[in-house]
Amino acid sequence: MDSFKTLQEHKETIRLFMEYGVPGEFAEPAAALLDKFEADIIGLNLFHNFYSCLPEGTEDAIEKLLLLARKQGVFLLCASSFSGTNYLYLVNNEGAVLLGTLAEGLPDRKLLDFFGFKDNESFLALGKDLSCIEEYEISPADRSLCPACQAAVGEYHILGCPVEICPWCNGQLTRCNCRFTRLDVENFDRESQIEKLQERLDTEGRLPFAKEHSPGYPSDVLSDEGDETGVRRQESGDRSKKNF
């Protein structure tokens, strides 16, 4: 995903894509939905993926977002379009990935295990009646979620999250020197170093997110990092190297 300096810039880019991809009769409700999530990076990331590369290659618009599952700052969302198709997206603070349609299910075994589904059949059963699935609603001021990586209370942060507390000194993990001294390195410029740091953190005992860790305003943390789009997924090293 492209890097955006502000959420407003992110929104305006999406709006530009919408001008070319949204049918006229759906322009108003589609714009209203975008406005609703203008301060929510998860919603904006999904919109950006959808409108920048329309799934079917034809004009369409998102009518509503449904929350299928959420874990450790990763959201499994259904984007119901005005054309009647329900698209399945994997979303976090860094971006969104189209997985297919809800009718196709979630065939990836790792994703099924991650979100706690027994098999694809059990996942498909979830989508049989969309009226029973709650709409995705989130406030950036929700203190039960990490304002930077969206991990819920009791869950581990995405590695590199600026809110995570260091288990060795109780300082801010991305700012204290423990990550360097524990590995006896001066900087992190290789994937193997990031992986080794995670192993050390797991051994020591990472501190899961707690409400008292949350700053007064999400922008306080995000602005310190200079990027309101959040942190990169753990398996991607570029941003991890930047934060570590």
Regions found by a protein language model. Give the residues of each.
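Long, charged N-terminal interaction/targeting segments
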Residues: 2-132
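Cys/His-clustered metal-coordination modules, chiefly Zn-binding fingers
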Residues: 114-226
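Short, C-terminally biased terminal segments at protein or domain edges
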Residues: 226-244
